[in-house]
Amino acid sequence: MAFNDNPAHVAALNQLISELEADGVKIVDKRGWFWKALHYIVLVVTFGGQRDFLKGYYTTIAHWIGVPEGWDERSAASRFAVLKHEYIHICQARKLGFGNAVVGLPLYGLLYLLVPLPLGLAYFRWRYEREAYVIGIRARLELQPHLRMRLIDSAIKQLTTGRYGWTWPFKRTVRRYFETHVPEATPVTEGDLQLVP
């Protein structure tokens, strides 16, 4: 638990984790040879634009959510939003795999990484990430409504730079999308939180 974490946020996070685990989702540390190899591949493919893959980024592969060092030190509100975002990627892979994320992974990976281009105009990555970012931002705003513009700015920075392989490099278009799809939020009570979509 992060220092001075809000108990209601911790309760919401714990409930979400329980629901995800019941749905077959596995939260794993990004340690070991597989994640290190993936880090170097990402580093090369993004021409050095993504240097924080192991320490600052979350990665979903089928029904596994890889979390970086320091996961447990992040605020409950941040972890809640991240898990909501990453769960959307699991749902996207499941749609392509007839309900099974592992079956959907090859097609999902192909679309996410290569169509129509791997860098610069990655339309499916833009579609998949914008959906997940909207859900993640909305989830964070349920707990911390004052962060709206900061979270939108962060999403824009991620999706229009080398961090995500210049997914959709049109900053004004990306900003307009998020400002339209992420409404101003008001705090909700614990009973009002929608945990798993």
How does the language model describe each region?
Residues K36-F47, N100, G104-P116:
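Short hydrophobic helices that act as membrane-entry/anchoring signals
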